[in-house]
Amino acid sequence: SILQKYHPTPDFQQAFKHEKSGNFVMKYASGQALVTLPFFIVGHMWASNSTIYPADGFSFPYHFSVGVGLFLLSLLGMFYLRKVLLVYFKDRTVAALLIIYVIGTNYINYAAVDQAMTHNTLFTIYALLLWMTIRFYIAYESRYAIAIGILTGLATLIRPTEIISILIPIFWGINSISGLKTRIDVIKKQFSKFVLAGIFFGLVAMIQPIYWKIVANEWLGYSYGD
């Protein structure tokens, strides 16, 4: 079996057996799997055309493709963080801040060693979300609203508590009561854009309830099963 061949975990606790359906249900939300899917597909194509590695989802091509893909995703997050910071600070200041961030946090570990963890994926999503929010309040274009909806939905799909990410585009730049009143006026005038963002948020976030419905015949589930 996969467990005996690759020993991916000392104790198979990533899923639990659902009592009513009899199916195994993954404990973790599906967002990270969705993010890694393109890289997994590359690994699968590699393994499927290889005479050395089995196309079983766990051989070297999968590890390599997912690892490199998520490493590049971490770099994308750094790229967009720089773009966000340059809106407010000079280039030298931004360079110093990025260096401090890289050497003073776990960024390198989650970029180059533990890429499959959600930390740097969420880092990149938040960097993109900040950038799309800034652009939205400059141009009020539908494409930015759609991006905001997808990014907040994906963050929630990765870690449900990240639903708080929706507060960023709603309250971004508000630092006074008058600013809050202005934002309310903006929401009224650009209501269709906010609805559009909400629709795409829902489309992405609904992936998790759909998964639960398919495997456990329940729209809402407590995935840890204890």
Model regions and ranges:
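Membrane-interface transmembrane helices that cradle and orient dolichyl/undecaprenyl
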Residues: 129-145, 179
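Transmembrane signal-anchor helices characteristic of membrane glycosylation enzymes that use polyprenol
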Residues: 1-2, 99-106, 156, 199-214
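Membrane-interface catalytic loops of GT-C/OST-like multi-pass glycosylation enzymes that act
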Residues: 26, 110-120, 158-160, 213-226
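Membrane-interface alpha helices of multi-pass inner-membrane proteins
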Residues: 144-159, 166-170, 202-203
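Membrane-lumen/periplasm interface segments of specific transmembrane helices
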Residues: 168, 172-176, 189-226
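Interfacial juxtamembrane loops and adjacent helix segments
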Residues: 1-68
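Aromatic- and kink-enriched transmembrane "portal" helix at the membrane-lumen/periplasm boundary
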Residues: 54-77, 98-128, 132, 153, ...
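Transmembrane-helix signature of polytopic, membrane-embedded enzymes
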Residues: 48-57, 76-105, 124, 138-148
